[in-house]
Amino acid sequence: IYITEPMKYKNLFFDLDDTIWAFSRNARDTFEEVYQKYSFDRYFDSFDHYYTLYQRRNTELWLEYGEGKVTKEELNRQRFFYPLQAVGVEDEALAERFSEDFFAIIPTKSGLMPHAKEVLEYLAPQYNLYILSNGFRELQSRKMRSAGVDRYFKKIILSEDLGVLKPWPEIFHFALSATQSELRESLMIGDSWEADMTGAHGVGTVSYTHLTL
């Protein structure tokens, strides 16, 4: 990682999923594990068939969640039920059991993005490090502990705390206020151009960068 004008910044806000914690890999591993447990090959041509259906609906639902059109509970219910419905399996109880197992397992996964821990080890003595994430509270802290990175961060700020997702400006202002950070001394680091970069830039004087560790 290279930060221009390093003395300018005191506060580094990190996204968590796929910036530090390897969400895509950890989630896929968890899905495969639970898929096998419930013998879903009897319903789907392959795991990839199931996962493609899930991801399609999950993406749609997160957009609706960000717009306030569905609740967190409805998002979770629909995204696990949809793949089964798509192949004619109207078993909502099965989808709920799958969901419960998924959420029990995924925060125990410890996979990190390449060099994430080394970067945090380097930055922690020099900057105030914070997490700013759209993830759910019951998962994010546990994921960080499982991966051994919780100790690097002074505070975790979640969009769920405010009810507003990144990239809306309100969540960035909320994070700055919650950490008593000055705009001109703060930098947002994340993997999503829209949620992390555009959102931070839209606040005005918050500096930002696009970083994949």
Language-model features, listed with the residues they occupy:
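Short, Lys/Arg-enriched N-terminal segments with co-localized hydrophobic residues
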Residues: 1-6
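N-terminal helical cap/lid subdomain that shapes the substrate entry/recognition surface
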Residues: 8-114
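Short acidic capping loops at alpha-helix termini that bridge into adjacent secondary structure
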Residues: 46, 92-93, 151-155, 183-186
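Substrate-recognition element of Asp-dependent hydrolases with the DxDx(T/V) motif
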Residues: 97-111, 116-147, 153, 157-159, ...
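Conserved Lys-Pro-Asp/Glu-containing loop-to-beta segment of HAD-superfamily phosphomonoesterases
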Residues: 166-197
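Conserved small/polar residues in nucleotide/adenosyl-binding loops
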Residues: 209-213
